[in-house]
Amino acid sequence: CFTADRVIFPQDDHIDIDGAHFGVLSLPGHSAGHIGFVTPDGAAYVGDCLIDQHEIDAAKLPTSMFIAKDLDSKAALRATDYPAYIIAHKQVVTDRAELSALIDSNIAFIHRKERELLDDLTDGMTFSDWIYAFCQRENIRTRQELKFSIVERNFTNFTDWLTDTGKVRVERDFCAKRYYHG
């Protein structure tokens, strides 16, 4: 457990640290209150709102609590204009065309995984059946509880989004949830 040095509220559009003025960007999706910062020299640090192409290529699923909000936050970055964007803790993008392509790639990644998960679903599957089919296709073979809990959390967030959008429907069969194409 830790104590925050400072709390940033949803309505805050900036913070001042030791006399330096930082803008605050609301970028929910990756996490509920995910934010980015604009440095005093104008660079936008967008954190995990965007990931680089290498991470996209290696990822089994996006790490996102709220897929719909994540898609909105990614798309909203198109309307911003900063001289540099710091992406997912490591890449710096200064070219607008490169940023636009990276946004497109991040959004396409989510929609590709959407199609794959829908392909994995056989109507009437339980959650356990569905995630098992996903893990088989993605060749996820871990016995480590922590690693699997991350896969399970990301899969759950994704299935919730598919349900919210009507692409999947859930029916109760006694004590089991069964999933069907919407």
Residue map of PLM features:
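C-terminal regulatory/interaction regions
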Residues: E116-G182
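Active-site HxH/HxHxD metal-binding segment of metal-dependent hydrolases
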Residues: C1-I17
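Structural motif
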Residues: D18, P40, E171-F174
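Metallo-beta-lactamase
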Residues: H21-P28, A32-H111
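Charged, glycine-enriched surface loops/patches
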Residues: I17, H111-R115
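A structural motif corresponding to the C-terminal end of an alpha-helix
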Residues: T3-V7, A76-D81, K167
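Well-ordered beta-strand positions enriched in small/hydrophobic/aromatic, beta-favoring residues
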Residues: I15, I35-F37, Y179
